[in-house]
Amino acid sequence: MSSENINISSTNVKGKCDNKCSYAFKYSESSSTAKNNGVLINLTYDSTSVPPVVYNSEKYIVENINIVSPSIHTFNNVSMPGEIIISHTPQSGGIPLKVCIPFTSSSESSSASQIITDIINKVASNAPSEGDSTNLNMNFSLQQIVPRKPFFVYTGEYSGVNANWIVYGELEAIPLSSTTITTLQQIIQAFPIATPGGDLFYNSKGPISGLQLGDGIYISCQPTGSSEEETSVEYDKNSTSFDFSNIFESPIFKSIIIIIIGCLLLIIIFYGISIFYKYLTTDGELPKLT
């Protein structure tokens, strides 16, 4: 592992990891508190009964969120105005997972831009100095912040602890206005955080879509569109039993009932026609039932 800070760039990629860097998430809303640590903004995130993240078959919960300025990574050898670092703790032991998204100065806006801007402004108003804390009084979800786009992956240290890193590239940076970036730089100071890492890999597919985490199903597979992947499904042992009452609401069940009724009607009609035909061909005598 190199002692130099890793540079997030396509020119540094050793290979693709579409098959071995599977990232799935379904983050819930949180009413967070923020603390100004002088060199970063630290945010709490509400815990949930179901881990919101699965990375390479391991389940993770959100530990905390940090906002720094400038970015702790370089992107094509250039620092970005800021970066959000989402720290995850493994549920069953293992190394932590960090998900990082850089900020860029832009007049464009997104839902992530609005959330980050609101957080920065609230901290600037209510916790502008080192050591200050504030309740944000806003609900937000990382679901609206983490892009469903390709990302880079490496394994490296953070504060002396080995971790898996997912880092979104410059193209996926969260746009913030120059005013918001200036506000951020006024309430926290730049601090060089070392991010040495090993080989850099690239997941061109992005996070897995369509998972229903929390319904007792966890899927460790590759992103949608990967034709060479096998999908393994692990069912929660505590999932509820099948509800037979749902059968009667099923469109398939209703279609089957309609077909059966239609067949019975056709049988009755043909039987009636047969009796009427025999009546006409036997001089008006109806056949006798024995």
Name every feature range the model reports, one short phrase each.
Residues 1-290:
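Alpha-carbonic anhydrase
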